[in-house]
Structures are given as structure tokens and as C-alpha cells.
Amino acid sequence: ERSWLFLTVLMQAMYQHRFLYLNQSDLMQRYPEIDRGMTRLLSLKRQTTNQLATTLLASVDISAHPQRLDKVADSMAITLMYWLSFEQLTGSPQTPQQTIHRAVLQVLSHCAPYLGEQQTDFYRECELIDARLLDTHSP
């Protein structure tokens, strides 16, 4: 649940500054200083997702397989960086909270395949958190 809340806060900040994420390539080509900043931001997100994946997958000792851990963390970071563009491209109308919680669920889902028998419980817990948080934000 702490991971979910952490990612929710992170995605809320990203959503508030979504103009940086919706046209990243164009923005970085036009403004080199933004390119450097986005590169730094991606590096920080990779570090964060590596720590997050390490924590979430501690029960299956993925740290014994650093290459796997790096792949999971990179997938999580990619999802974080490009989720808002993906949502825009799908064209499905979503409230900001729905967009944020869908992103969080997607980021966390990168860990699920490594959880073995715990995978179903992990998804169920994520879905319960998602439903509870969306319910508290309903009009």
C-alpha cells in the first residue's frame, strides 16, 4: 500500500506538469536544457523504480538476479515516463484520478510475473486499493 501511495503522489505531480510528458521528443529537440533535465529525471525514476522493485520483490529474492531486477525497474520507469502520452493516444476519456490510478496499477503490474503464487494476491490487493481510492474521489 505504501508503494501505491508513493506512486500516486508521484503521478499526481507528473499529471500537474503533464505538458512536459505529452510531447517529450519535440520539447527536448526545441529546448536542449529540457533535454538534460529529462535525462536526469529519467535517471532518478530508474533509481526509484529499482528501489521499488527491490522492495516489492524481496519475498522472491530477485536481488539474486540483478539483470532481471534492472529489466523490471526499466519497464516501470518507461511506464512512468510515457503513461500520460499513452493515455492521450488511446483517447479514452478518463478523470485525472482514473488516469493516475491506472498508471500506478500498470507500473506495479510489472512486478507481478515474478511473484509466483503470490501474483493473484498482489493483483487483488492492488485492485482493492485502486477501488478504495477511486471511491473516495468520486463526486
Regions found by a protein language model. Name each.
Residues 59-77, 126-136:
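Charge-rich, acidic-biased intrinsically disordered regions
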Residues 34-59, 70-85, 102-113:
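Amphipathic alpha-helical packing segments from all-alpha helical-bundle domains
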Residues 89-139:
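C-terminal peripheral helix-coil segments that are non-catalytic and often amphipathic
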Residues 1-3, 30, 34, 65-69, ...:
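Residue-level recognition of alpha-helical structural elements
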Residues 9, 20, 30, 121-128:
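Bimodal feature
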Residues 15-36, 50-55:
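Amphipathic alpha-helical segments used for helix-helix packing
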Residues 21-28, 56-60, 83, 87-91:
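Secondary-structure edge/capping motif, primarily at the C-terminal ends of alpha-helices
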Residues 1-19:
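Hydrophobic alpha-helical connector segments
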